[in-house]
Amino acid sequence: NSLLNLTNETKRKVEIKIAIAYHSDMKKVKEIVYQILQEEKRILENEPKDVFLDSFDDSGMTLGIRAWVKTEDYWKTTWDLREKVKETFDANGIEIPYNRLEVDLLTNKESGVQ
């Protein structure tokens, strides 16, 4: 077994996953996220930025976001990006889904009991 010390690296990849509703316009969502990444000054310009559909889940789809930053900027950039994505999604009507349970009540026609 070996231990990898990420603090010795000069750059680190930010990876964020966020759920979006199934009815979301994927093209619009990706454009918005790429714009957020472009505006974030701590993201390294010459490194790849990825926005992709990561998975289909019970209540929505998971969007993956990846970008590179200096190691010392990793946590603050990660937190700020999450907040900016949430604010921008809210402003653009993009729903972040949550698990729901639908319950149908059945009525016994003879007794009227639910």
Stretches with model-predicted labels:
Residues N1-K11:
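Membrane-contacting alpha-helices and adjoining membrane-interface segments
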Residues L6, I20-S24, K28, Y34, ...:
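Solvent-exposed, non-transmembrane regulatory segments of membrane-associated proteins
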Residues T10-Y22:
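Short glycine-/aliphatic-rich beta-strand segments at the starts of folded cytosolic domains
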Residues E40-K41:
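Acidic-histidine catalytic/liganding microenvironments
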